Amino acid sequence: MNVGHIVSVIGVVVDVEFAPGQVPDIYSAVKIRTEDQEDKSTKWNLTLEVAQHLGNNRVRCIAMSSTEGLKRGMKVVSTGKAISVPVGRPVLGRLLNVLGEEADGLEPIKAEKYYPIHRPAPALVDQSTKAEMLETGIKVIDLMIPFLKGGKIGLFGGAGVGKTVIVMELINNIAKQHGGISVFAGVGERTREGNDLYHEMKEAGVLEKTIMVFGQMNEPPGARLRVGLTGLTMAEFFRDEEGADTLLFIDNIFRFTQAGSEVSALLGRMPSAVGYQPTLATEMGQLQERITSTRKGSVTSVQAIYVPADDLTDPAPANAFAHLDATVVLSRAISELGIYPAVDPLDSTSRILDPQVVGKEHYECARGVQSVLQRYKELQDIIAILGMDELSDEDKLTVARARKLQRFLSQPFHVAETFTGRPGKYVSLKDTIRSFNEILAGKHDALPEQAFYMAGAIEEVMENAKRIEAGA
């Protein structure tokens, strides 16, 4: 047994000295347990991860849980391997922490297989190059930013514009329709949201096909930095061993970066731009490159990415952009209009919005909607200064249509029924394209624009218009 002892504790960073020639490897796990200590009055079961070799047989470790009460001289045992977490069928339907330990108060997990959380990304030759669209039932996403099956999708937005609500709705729509295995990694987010999600999924009956891994806001940075890898490792097992199409939801990638920044400062690394860690791009790459689809199976990931101060050029969101197949940008200006989901259809992009993949009709419909909205955006300055009366008849019609399209891009969500008081709507891609084509063709120019707000397909808009007329 390889035993060392603590020589210093600074917050969550612990320096440990081992015997010469017995120094554990980088990324290997070391443990502080009650049975190894002389003083057994305090219960200890603390896992740390080796982050640096300091020389003189000393290593610098990051704790995965609270270091309160640690003293110099306490014994530390090296496990000789990286943090390993249970994988496979026994983990389904469970709520776990960063170490793969049960956090739902149910019986212990009896898993046959354990995987280390640090694993190489699949080789380029093993990766899949198939392009197929994944239907979500959310109009603005399916039409303007189609998701790639087995791709990486990022939801970018500042505080309070609805990232988590969209992630929840996607879980509701895709996990229920898809019927496959879903993994949810809660990285540094609110405990309340995790609790709500757990109970919602339990009620919806999708929990037995879901694994939930949490490293919440109140946990040390070590746990928040590694919980994304824990969730990913569990998803990789189903992709590689069972050839399954797995869904991976991560909320929030920014907190992963933030935890890395905290740890980096404690390790004494020189900060880079905006105070972030110098290894930001490497850390992001190590996580993102593993989220991929192979010839055996796929991992489709949906990642919420907080944008500090609504600045998309901040290094944390900017670094994530390069790895994604589709970027859904949520706009505060749109949320202020009361249009939810507050997706900016002009700023968001998808790699597969291409006639070769989605078909000519879908592509032309999406580009038609974009061009009307873009023209409206250009005219807004003129409207603000001179008013609507100064516009040509053609531009007046464009503005009227754009306002209808903008409102029609809103949609009532199943997970937000308690807030909106409206039943959620799942709109098929076929209905979405048909509805938008009719608006672009001018078939519904006579309908009032408020009829388009929070509707499903175009038939519901017509019903709303009749109701408004009857009420008037």
Swiss-Prot record:
**GO molecular-function terms, A-Z:** ATP binding; ATP hydrolysis activity; proton-transporting ATP synthase activity, rotational mechanism
Q: Which Gene3D superfamilies match?
A: 2.40.10.170, Bovine Mitochondrial F1-atpase, Atp Synthase Beta Chain, Chain D, domain 3, P-loop containing nucleotide triphosphate hydrolases
Family matches, as CDD domains: ATP-synt_F1_beta_C (cd18110), ATP-synt_F1_beta_N (cd18115), F1-ATPase_beta_CD (cd01133)
Q: What's its catalytic activity?
A: ATP + H2O + 4 H(+)(in) = ADP + phosphate + 5 H(+)(out)
Q: Which residues bind ATP?
A: 157-164
One Gene Ontology cellular component term attached to this UniProt record is:
proton-transporting ATP synthase complex
In terms of HAMAP family, this protein maps to: ATP_synth_beta_bact (MF_01347)
For this entry, the protein name equals ATP synthase subunit beta
What is the organism of origin for this protein? Answer: Desulforamulus reducens (strain ATCC BAA-1160 / DSM 100696 / MI-1) (Desulfotomaculum reducens)
**What is the taxonomic lineage of the source species?**
Bacteria, Bacillati, Bacillota, Clostridia, Eubacteriales
Gene that encodes it: atpD
